[in-house]
């Protein structure tokens, strides 16, 4: 893709999200979602392979269905309230339709089937955009309408997402699919706290985006898409091996890394609201994610796979690509836990 075309498409994707973030009118929000969806498809298809075309088609059909449900919910809300404002949704049917549409756009269970397939069919850079930037707009609308959402519906979807995100990633060898299932699980954690403390959801989203960006950048730097290619990292870039190990543990939510902080705060907030069984169940389910990340870390950093190259290290290293954003992102992704007491102001 030529740079001028890429710049135009990327600015349209960003403009669509910004329209959603800054609007309080339902029609403008819907237009923002449509702009974003139509602009992201050429980015997903930039590889020009049958797999990328299939992934883009799946993404388009899912997002178009979600947009249709969203518009239906908006029209029902307009019939009952007589206004286009996002401030409140008095009708439960309209609220349910809007919630389902937004969770479908996020890829939460039971509408999660497209996420692993689409992520696997596209390049690492496109997958990075899909699993980070594309989550911002739907979550911002859920944040704004959180008082009108049915808590039981959202909690049910959150539990299903955490379960499927954990179980789905157990049998995977493709890194993009593992990150896709991890995304589904993280969306579940964000959804469960949304009706109790929406600001905590924003914190969780920020940490999730930082960790996912760092992980994708490391995989892109190393050109790794499978666990087998990742197992040769020690031979090419020894420092990357340690960084990937720590980032995997952080994404799995292992203390004392940054990924543990949002889970800790969410469990604390739920227990303050006299909910004991739900946070206990979610904490146990999070161990599934931690397990497949530990397995990935073991493959990457703690074992040496059979190789035709008998040397322990390359005599000539590849020229390291300079990624300016990577060092601060890795620091935030791994060392944020000591700052957790400062984040208590969010409550």
Curated annotation (Swiss-Prot):
Catalytic class of the enzyme: translocase
GO cellular component, one term: mitochondrial inner membrane
Keyword Signal: no
Compartment annotation: Mitochondrion inner membrane
Keywords: Electron transport, Membrane, Mitochondrion, Mitochondrion inner membrane, NAD, Respiratory chain, Translocase, Transmembrane, Transmembrane helix, Transport, Ubiquinone
Sequence intervals crossing the membrane: 3-23, 25-45, 60-80, 96-116, 122-142, 153-173, 178-198, 200-220, 237-257, 274-294, 323-343
EC number of the protein: 7.1.1.2
GO biological processes: mitochondrial electron transport, NADH to ubiquinone; mitochondrial respiratory chain complex I assembly
Record carries keyword Electron transport: yes
Family: Belongs to the complex I subunit 2 family.
Annotated PANTHER family: NADH-UBIQUINONE OXIDOREDUCTASE CHAIN 2
Subunit annotation: Core subunit of respiratory chain NADH dehydrogenase (Complex I) which is composed of 45 different subunits. Interacts with TMEM242.
Role according to the record: Core subunit of the mitochondrial membrane respiratory chain NADH dehydrogenase (Complex I) which catalyzes electron transfer from NADH through the respiratory chain, using ubiquinone as an electron acceptor. Essential for the catalytic activity and assembly of complex I.
Protein name: NADH-ubiquinone oxidoreductase chain 2
Organism the protein comes from: Halichoerus grypus (Gray seal)
Lineage of producing organism: Eukaryota, Metazoa, Chordata, Craniata, Vertebrata
Name of the coding gene: MT-ND2
